[in-house]
Amino acid sequence: MTHKFAICLYQPDMPQNLGVIIRTAACLEFPLHIIKPLPFSMTDKRFKGAVMDYIDHCEIVNHENWDNFYLYSKKNNNRIILATTKTDNNLYEFKFKDNDIILFGKETAGVPETIHNTVNNKI
């Protein structure tokens, strides 16, 4: 199935946030990519309380690390668009394309500078 967008989370470190994003992705029918490692288990009660039963309705693609995700995106002709405060690009003027993947960094640390320098664009 071809999707207009996908969401990617880089090493999320708050289980309840991951649960809520899975619910959002399920409702919008967006695939969700998760770049590991995770500092918590999917059996964590905070995660389970936030995700409820939506995990069964979300297409989740797990990647063991950034390199695996990056190779996946190249193989599938996806642009990686980083959501960051370190850009002058205006979200509302940005020209998205089909199959873009919007990347969000860790809640507590964002993404490393090497990833900032690797992505296709920033919003």
Region spans (language model):
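Post-transcriptional modification and biogenesis factors for structured RNAs
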Residues: 1-123
